[in-house]
Design a protein with these regions (language model features):
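Residue-level detector of anion-binding/catalytic polar loops
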Residues: 110, 139, 203
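Rossmann-like NAD(P)H-binding beta-loop-alpha module
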Residues: 134-137, 141-200, 214, 222
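Substrate-binding/catalytic subdomain of NAD(P)-dependent oxidoreductase enzymes
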Residues: 183-184, 191-262
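Rossmann-fold NAD(P)-binding glycine/threonine-rich loop
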Residues: 94-107, 116-143, 148-158
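Short acidic, glycine/serine/threonine-rich loops at helix termini
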Residues: 16-19, 49-54, 123-126, 151-157, ...
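Glycine-rich phosphate-binding loop of nucleotide-binding enzymes
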Residues: 91, 112-114
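Conserved active-site and cofactor/substrate-binding residues in soluble primary-metabolism enzymes
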Residues: 7, 11, 15, 35, ...
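N-terminal glycine-/serine-/threonine-rich beta1-alpha1-beta2 phosphate-ribose binding loop
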Residues: 1-107
């Protein structure tokens, strides 16, 4: 029996719940494992049940039944799980959650991550996390960090494992910026297009992560490391589109004061 805990119930998390609800039976039949959705967690509240949650109704139940839970009590609940293995699904953009990967590894949890922060952290921290999962025999899988779910990371790793040397990687590494510049023709203020993309879930929770180039930088660091290069995030040259007076503060502050983008 494999227990699953989903961290993040935004665009990616809600779509994953739809997919899991549809594929749960097929997945179990194909693999021979019983997959149980044990919890859904956001930044403030948790909905947890060792017996399992109905993925198709988890969000509705979450709104009515989720409770506020501190990090320590949640971790204790996870450590007491009754399953053969516990898998953490991190579909957040949370640095706080990424900082817990070492603890997850040390307590025998697997991690599947769409969160780029751990994979694009400093080299020393990245190696520390990677080694922790290696030593405990747990999996840290992060193919979902680059390429919108396409097996880009796997392809790069397979080439390296086959003895190839990767000299360069090229591509469009930001679906957000690609969409924005495709739409922009001067008739609609650029900030309005950014707002549209944000409302449609095409950006990071904070669109400044896309506009600053940080999102692309993180993807490049992750891919470069998969290709065998020892690289630090600050070695990637980034030119930000975010006006200096909008770099700090809330997302609302950014939208209210982002006229310079136009």
């Amino acid at each position: 029996r494999i227990g699953l805990i989903l961290f993040g119930k935004g665009n990616i998390g809600s779509r994953w719940l739809e997919l899991f609800a549809r594929e749960q039976t097929t997945l179990s039949a194909r693999t021979g494992f019983e997959f149980i959705l044990a919890g859904v967690v956001d930044s403030r509240r948790s909905l947890l049940n060792y017996e399992g949650l109905d993925a198709s109704r988890a969000l509705a139940f979450f709104n009515d039944e989720a409770v506020e839970q501190d990090e320590e009590s949640l971790f204790l609940w996870m450590r007491a799980h009754p399953y053969d293995d516990l898998v953490v699904l991190d579909v957040t953009a949370s640095e706080q959650l990424a900082d817990q990967y070492l603890d997850f590894a040390s307590h025998g949890f697997h991690v599947i991550s769409a969160n780029k922060l751990a994979g694009a952290s400093s080299s020393s921290k990245y190696r520390q996390i990677h080694d922790a999962f290696e030593k405990t025999g747990r999996h840290w899988l992060y193919n979902a960090t680059v390429g919108a779910g396409l097996p880009v990371n796997h392809t790069v790793r397979d080439l390296i494992d086959s003895g190839d040397t990767i000299l360069a990687l090229s591509g469009i590494f930001s679906g957000t910026l690609s969409w924005l510049f495709l739409q922009f023709d001067g008739t609609v203020p650029f900030t309005d297009l950014v707002d549209q993309a944000w409302q449609q879930g095409l950006t990071e929770p904070d669109p400044r992560v896309d506009l600053s180039g940080k999102d692309v930088m993180r993807k490049l660091v992750i891919l470069a490391r998969e290709a065998g290069y020892d690289i630090e995030p600050d070695q990637v040259r980034v030119e930000s589109l975010v006006p200096a007076h909008c770099e700090e503060g809330s997302v609302d502050h950014f939208f209210e004061n982002g006229e310079a983008l136009n």
